[in-house]
């Protein structure tokens, strides 16, 4: 699959770190370091615009090392870049750690994962007719217990 990209000056294409990687690294397109205080959110530009093929999306996901070591997460994980979006890819990062985190210029801050998209047809059913029944029913949010 090919994704065409427009790049701002000095910006690198997303890169897969290993042959088997599913996520391509996205880098911070910033001129100066950004300090992210504990509990703070920031919008990090990448300097990349993408032309994603119809029927696909690009999901923006956290980097596991940043999450584990520093508590840095993509807030709307996974973030979705739709096939019809042509603006700059920006990443909403939050610091859930206990220390200030410094985002350096060109730092790898997130991953881009290409995924297929299926658009559903939503249909209203009459409440008398209702939805089909299942053994689970409407039980959710921890109904199966913790063990």
From Swiss-Prot:
Cofactor(s) listed in the protein's UniProt record: Mg(2+)
Keywords of the record: Hydrolase, Magnesium, Metal-binding, Nucleotide metabolism
Pathway(s) it belongs to: Pyrimidine metabolism; dUMP biosynthesis; dUMP from dCTP (dUTP route): step 2/2
UniProt EC number: 3.6.1.23
Chain positions recorded as substrate binding sites: 63-65, 76, 80-82
Presence of the UniProt keyword Oxidoreductase in the record: no
A GO biological-process term: dUMP biosynthetic process
Reaction(s) catalysed (UniProt annotation): dUTP + H2O = dUMP + diphosphate + H(+)
GO molecular function terms attached to this record: dUTP diphosphatase activity; magnesium ion binding
InterPro entries: dUTPase, dUTPase-like, dUTPase-like_sf, dUTPase_trimeric
EC category name: hydrolase
SUPFAM superfamilies named among the record's database cross-references: dUTPase-like (SSF51283)
Entries under Pfam families matching the protein: dUTPase
Family, per entry: Belongs to the dUTPase family.
Function: This enzyme is involved in nucleotide metabolism: it produces dUMP, the immediate precursor of thymidine nucleotides and it decreases the intracellular concentration of dUTP so that uracil cannot be incorporated into DNA.
Protein name: Deoxyuridine 5'-triphosphate nucleotidohydrolase
């Amino acid at each position: 699959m090919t994704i065409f990209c427009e790049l701002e000056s000095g910006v690198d294409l997303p890169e897969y770190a290993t042959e088997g990687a599913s996520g391509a690294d996205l880098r911070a397109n910033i001129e100066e370091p950004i300090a992210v205080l504990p509990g703070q959110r920031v919008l990090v530009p990448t300097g990349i615009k993408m032309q994603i093929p119809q029927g696909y999306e690009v999901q923006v996901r956290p980097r596991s090392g940043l999450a584990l070591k520093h508590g840095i997460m993509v807030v709307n994980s996974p973030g979705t870049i739709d096939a019809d979006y042509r603006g700059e890819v920006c990443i909403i990062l939050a610091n859930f750690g206990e220390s200030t985190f410094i985002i350096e210029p060109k730092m790898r801050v997130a991953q881009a994962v290409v995924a297929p998209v299926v658009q559903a047809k939503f249909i209203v059913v009459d409440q008398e007719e209702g939805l089909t029944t299942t053994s689970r029913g409407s039980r959710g949010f921890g109904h199966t217990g913790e063990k």
